[in-house]
Amino acid sequence: MHAFVTQDRARRVAVMKLRAPELTGRGWLNTGGADITLTSLRGKVVVLDFWTFCCINCLHVLDELRPLEEKYGDQLVLIGVHSPKFEHEADRDALEAAVERYAVHHPVLDDPDLTTWQAYAARAWPTLVVLDPEGYIVASMSGEGHAHGLSVLIDDLIAEHTTKGTLRRGDGPYVAPPAPETLLRFPGKVITAPARPVQAQPTGRQSADDAASSAGAGEHLTSGGFFVSDTAHHQVVHLAEDGETELARYGGPGVFNEPQGLLLLPEEARARTGDDLLVADSVNHEIKAIRLSDGRIRTVAGTGEQLRERDGGGPALRQALSTPWDLAWWHDRVIIAMAGTHQLWALHLGESPELNTVAVLAGTSNEGIRDGAAHDAWFAQPSGLATSADGSHVWVADSETSALRSLSVSDEGFEVTTHVGQGLFDFGHVDGAADAALLQHPLGVTELPDGSVAVADTYNGAIRRFDPSSGEVTTLATGLAEPSDVIVVPGEVDADAHLLVVESNAHRLTPVALTAEAQRIEGDAQQTQRPPSEIASGAVELVVTFTPPAGQKLDHRYGDPTMLQVSSSPEAFLRDGAGKQQGLTRTLTIDESVGSAILHVSVRAAACDGDPDTGEVPEHAACHLYQQDWGIPLVITGDGPRTLTLDLRGV
């Protein structure tokens, strides 16, 4: 046993053991109707994953945990605790759909009132809590990148409790639900297929990049219709003009992994690159291209690995990406909604993929709303893109801020503007003046023939309209099942045009009339409901705890490997202490007159594998990046604490 592991175990033993609170909620999913208690889990290593299905970081962690589920089999039980951010996420049917959509193959506790969230003092999505086989909490960690450390910890716990005789093997509580079959399954995005004849050979499930195998449907000539990302089937589908008749399928689980955004390249770019259709291959963290003439699929950007840093650029095939969600063509480049890093990137296409380059176009990777110069702007999971008809800007559906935003060219460079939306924790269905109107987690956007904008207001189940000339927001349609995209289907004249909506949770494309008269809905303004933490006014110490996993240590050879960024909404809450600098502690000065606020904290820490005997970090050691963003509601009280402690990784 490495000395690091022994030290890690000794550290846990030295700390007073805390019995895990019971798992309490509205009910369970993926258990065949059975309830789960901590007593029934005794003898297993348990990992609780506090998540919410809107959260891109939570989806990343789901993917990080899959290999652990497979590796440890009947020794580990993974429990998802779904504690919702948005009102829509508290809906039981919506949660069931999300569990299927994201292939969650473990039990999930439905925690709509945040009962278990509060019992475990969770403060961020995602949060992981590890329980030993005797039912005690042994570790808590927030954010992404913990898979390696979890594996080391689980190995340690298995060895320890095998020796003690307290480890129990055997089947876990997971029961797979029925798997329904539909033509489309949780479709993501739609675009219009080219009306000109293009010979295309449908392709089936492929296992190698740059492949072209047939699904057996034979050759056909495209005559319009639509391309749809059939996300849960991991394919791109060509549908006829009726939106229902299948003409061809491209890809499959061996090629795509939850494809989202689609982009038909302009004629010049098609001729230059030999590719026709680009695909945002979200979980593979790549941009892929389809050649319609023979079904060839190849990677044009990304390495297949998730980007852990929050910047990058250079040769596209050597640059990792992070959950690209949508694509648009603007100023002779491909704009990428990089949802995983809360940024917009640009892809420049050369004559071959080896000549392609990528660069960050807008966003610092901090989550939130900040307008102005693109390099200083903040986004939060941008998920929908549409280029304006005059080419002056790109419309952006910024999902986690429930906002409609745009990127345009200014005298100084690129500029970001918010048209509708208030911030990370404000949402609702409110029409009227744009500065007071509210959306709820929009995923799609398109420009209408009159220059106004249609937004797929996903969690409100609606299509909303923003009119830039009047500054008004109205509602075009309601009662839709998580609309994730919307496009305009033109008629012979503008008056004959209609909308085509991707109803993701209904697994279909739905035509919607484009009427001159729109509804005006005076719904409720809502905020994410989490109990605020009390805090004192004046000087307060912010402390982020980070204990590297056994076998790793912070590497100080080139300076402090940590970074802490702090801000607040409203900004006046912090009289001092805002900003970005190294270190995991910060003295904040809080203005008593403000009363309450959301404290935004972003942290990064890099730990490297150390020598098992000396603990020293070798010159070419493998390093691991740990990062998390918190949005913590705070309220000032007279006897509030003067220390705020957040766990990035506590053991």
Model-inferred region functions:
Residues H2-L38:
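N-terminal "domain-start" segment that seeds a small globular fold
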Residues L59-R101, P112-T116:
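Structural microenvironment flanking redox-active thiols in thiol-disulfide oxidoreductases
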Residues D132-A212, G216-L221, A518:
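Thiol-/selenol-based redox modules, centered on thioredoxin-like
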Residues R169-G188, R196-G204, D209-D210, H220, ...:
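Gly/Pro-rich loop segments of beta-rich domains
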Residues T192-V198, E219-S223, L264-G274, W329-D332, ...:
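Residue-level detector of Asp-centered blade-edge/turn motifs that repeat once per structural unit
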Residues E244, L514-V651:
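Extracellular/lumen-exposed scaffold segments
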